[in-house]
Amino acid sequence: MKCPFCGHPDSRVLDSRPTLDGTAIRRRRECIECGARFTTYERYELLPIIVVKKDGRRETFDRSKLLNGVLKACEKRPISYETLEKLVEEVELALQKQGSTEIPSKLIGELVMSKLRQIDQVAYVRFASVYKDFREIDQFLDIVRELKKDQEVD
C-alpha cells in the first residue's frame, strides 16, 4: 500500500487483527522506504447509500465526511478515535439495515445524536447545535435542560 507520508508504493504489514465488532480488519503498516507507520482498515463494500438532503439534493454517503463531523464535535473531549470509528461504523450498518439505498440526512443526524448522547453530552450538544442549526442561545439552553432532566430521571 502507498505510504501516505512519502508516497512510496510499498509497505509491510506489522500487525493485522479484526476490529472489536468484527466488521473490518485493522492493519498496522510500515513504509519500507521512510519507515513511517500508519494504520489501514479493510471493510466489506455494501450497496452505495444515497443521502437525500433537506433541500432534496442527493449525494453519495461519505463515511469520512460523517467521521469528520463527529471528530469536530468531539474535539478536546476524552473520547478515543476508536470509539468514534465504532460510532460511524454502527451508523453505517444501521443505514444499510434500512434496506433502502436512499436515506434522508435527518435519519443520519438522529442516529449520530443518539449515539453521541450516550458517549459524551458535550459532544452531543456540539453536534446537535450544528445539525439542528442553532441560531439562538435559548436553543442551547433547551437542549442542556433536556439532558439535565434525563439525568434526574436516571
From Swiss-Prot:
Cofactor(s) in the UniProt record: Zn(2+)
UniProt keyword annotations, A-Z: ATP-binding, DNA-binding, Metal-binding, Nucleotide-binding, Repressor, Transcription, Transcription regulation, Zinc, Zinc-finger
A Pfam family annotated for this UniProt entry: Zn_ribbon_NrdR
GO terms under biological process: negative regulation of DNA-templated transcription
Cofactor binding comment, as recorded: Binds 1 zinc ion.
Domain ATP-cone: 49-139
GO terms for MF: ATP binding; DNA binding; zinc ion binding
Annotated zinc fingers (unnamed), start-end: 3-34
Primary role: Negatively regulates transcription of bacterial ribonucleotide reductase nrd genes and operons by binding to NrdR-boxes.
Family of the protein in this entry: Belongs to the NrdR family.
Protein name as catalogued: Transcriptional repressor NrdR
